[in-house]
Amino acid sequence: FWDFWIMAFKDYDSKKVINYKIVSNENNTDYKNWVKELQEQWWVIRAIVCDWRKWLLWWFQDIPTQMCNFHQVAIIRRYITKKPILEANRELKSLTELLTKTDKESFSFWLWEWYEKHKDFLSEKVIWKDWKMHYLHNRTRSAYFSLKNNLQYLFVRYDNIWKIDIPNTTNWLEWVFGHIKAKVSLHRWLKKERKIKLILSLLYGKN
């Protein structure tokens, strides 16, 4: 919200925002401490769905933590663009778009197939102006390794499908914030305190 952040926890079952914090910036430690606070208040946290926050995903090893699949898709698009030209990038984009529609084993196999097909392409190097060897297709490599390294968090829903219903995206919370941002943008002249009051009324009005 331009000059401050609102961190929110929304309960998937009840569809209600159960807590929020207003902070000057967003960081993993705040989320970690907040989860601990909720647990101390006797909340039973059966699973967490979040956007890409590497340390946050790693910290909660005792709680199934699903990475939002659409955030992963967005990460890949930032690396290889929405309309990639190179064949390897086009194929990787198409593969990534299957994230929300397939299972862990199939996706892992397809990613391995893609790598085997393009590993020579990924390994290509050139000498730059500093007279050092650099990978030629750095952005493609970054996109691939992002998928590979995050794979264990992208299918937590699938791994726990018989235990608990975990969504694989944060769309249900993103929609709430999208609606709020649209409303708040109409009142940019409001002072911070009034703006926060408006946001909170909208936030809880969506409960």
Language-model features: locations:
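Acidic/histidine-rich catalytic cores and adjacent linkers
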Residues: 15, 43-53, 60, 93-207
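A generic structural micro-environment signature
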Residues: 28-29, 76-82, 172-173, 179, ...
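A short beta-strand motif that forms part of the nucleic acid-binding face
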Residues: 11, 24, 64, 74, ...
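A short hydrophobic/aromatic micro-motif that marks alpha-helical segments and, especially, helix-coil
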Residues: 26, 86, 187-189
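Conserved beta-strand -> loop -> alpha-helix junction used to position metal-binding or nucleic-acid-contacting
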Residues: 47-93
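RNase H-like nuclease fold core
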Residues: 1-49, 54, 58, 150-154, ...
